[in-house]
């Protein structure tokens, strides 16, 4: 990571305050039958230019277990449950090891088809995977969602992402050996790139994920959101960056080859706030005329994985692109 960027980003994050009374853990509906179990941990130890993960609680089993016991997962129709911390769920700095095991025991035997854990690739070890398999079982479908953002090293440096590609692929193969599926985050909207360069970077990255990662790996494509107390917001304030159009995200989706259309999902396309976002202030730009239509399209795309259907609705919405993007 860049020392200057990292230092300045950590200064910004110190100004982020969690609202008094915020639960240490909460169950949040994402979309359809996907839910997140969110833990207000002490904050990510990395320093991406677009993230505003601040400093929350130094979690312990004694602090979290009583709150977990108030959540009845069996009463909710959940297809996928995402385990998320304020950065990385497998980070022992954020989720102490005994708490990690307690959470696994809590979600086990709840008849949840898919359990996903969002974490930094450097937090994944064979020991942790073995514990996950021991507690959740060999037949449970388990995914890790990993930050990646771009296959291009120069673009990752703009994001201040600390990734070694060789090590990243080694971790991916480790996960494959234990039957852990991967969801790889791909980000649209890198600062200092043109719109065309931003789109092409995402297409190149999706191609890398599909061709170089283990079979069955999926990408998660999402447009960048400008949040308070981030370097991205600072760059906007001094006039060197502005939020992308929601139609740029549609254009990216429309240009993806049909053979890849069932290899990714989408996220963060519109207004979405929870205890962890600290207030997203700018999601992709739209106008009043097209906003509702776009939000409906994104939900439809998110909920349907059939490539032919996705291509159909992409062709339809791109053919009626709003004047606000022309």
Where in this protein do the model-derived segments appear?
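Auxiliary Fe-S-binding modules of radical SAM enzymes
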Residues: 2-20, 215, 220, 224-326
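N-terminal pre-triad scaffold of radical SAM enzymes
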Residues: 8-57, 72-84, 219
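Core AdoMet radical
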Residues: 54-71, 75-96, 110-125, 140-168, ...
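Acidic (Asp/Glu)-rich catalytic clusters
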Residues: 71-76, 103-110, 130-141, 172-179, ...
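Active-site-proximal loop/turn and secondary-structure-junction residues that shape catalytic pockets
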Residues: 87-89, 121-123, 150-152, 188-192, ...
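Distinct, well-ordered alpha-helical segments
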Residues: 93-102, 125-136, 196
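Surface-exposed cleft-lining segments at the edges of enzyme active sites
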Residues: 116-118, 153-161, 187-197, 235-240
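Conserved C-terminal portion of the radical SAM core fold
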Residues: 166-230, 249-268
């Amino acid at each position: 990571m860049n020392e200057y960027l990292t230092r300045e980003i950590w200064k910004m994050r110190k100004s982020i305050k969690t609202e008094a009374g915020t639960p240490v853990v909460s169950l949040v509906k994402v979309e359809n039958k996907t839910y997140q179990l969110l833990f207000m941990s002490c904050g990510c130890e990395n320093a991406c230019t677009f993230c505003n993960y601040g400093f929350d609680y130094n979690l312990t089993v004694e602090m979290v277990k009583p709150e977990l016991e108030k959540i009845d997962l069996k009463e909710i129709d959940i297809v996928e449950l995402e385990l998320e911390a304020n950065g990385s769920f497998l980070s022992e700095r954020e989720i102490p090891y005994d708490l990690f095991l307690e959470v696994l025991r809590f979600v086990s035997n709840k008849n949840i088809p898919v359990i996903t854990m969002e974490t930094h690739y450097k937090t994944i070890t064979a020991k942790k995977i073995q514990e996950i398999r021991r507690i959740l079982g060999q037949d449970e479908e388990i995914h890790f969602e990993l930050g990646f953002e771009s296959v291009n090293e120069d673009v990752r440096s703009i994001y201040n992402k600390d990734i070694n590609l060789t090590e990243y692929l080694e971790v991916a193969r480790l996960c494959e050996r234990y039957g852990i599926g991967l969801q790889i985050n791909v980000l649209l909207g890198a600062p200092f790139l043109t719109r065309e360069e931003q789109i092409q970077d995402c297409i190149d990255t999706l191609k890398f994920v599909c061709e170089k990662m283990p079979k069955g790996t999926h990408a998660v494509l999402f447009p960048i959101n400008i949040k308070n107390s981030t370097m991205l917001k600072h760059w906007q304030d001094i006039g060197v960056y502005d939020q992308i159009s929601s139609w740029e995200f549609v254009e990216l989706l429309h240009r993806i080859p049909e053979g890849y259309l069932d290899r990714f999902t989408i996220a963060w396309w519109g207004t979405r706030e929870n205890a962890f976002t600290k207030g997203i202030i700018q999601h992709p730009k739209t106008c009043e005329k097209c906003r509702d239509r776009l939000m409906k399209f994104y939900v439809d795309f998110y909920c349907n994985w059939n490539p032919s259907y996705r291509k159909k609705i992409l062709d339809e919405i791109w053919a009626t692109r709003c004047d606000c993007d022309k």
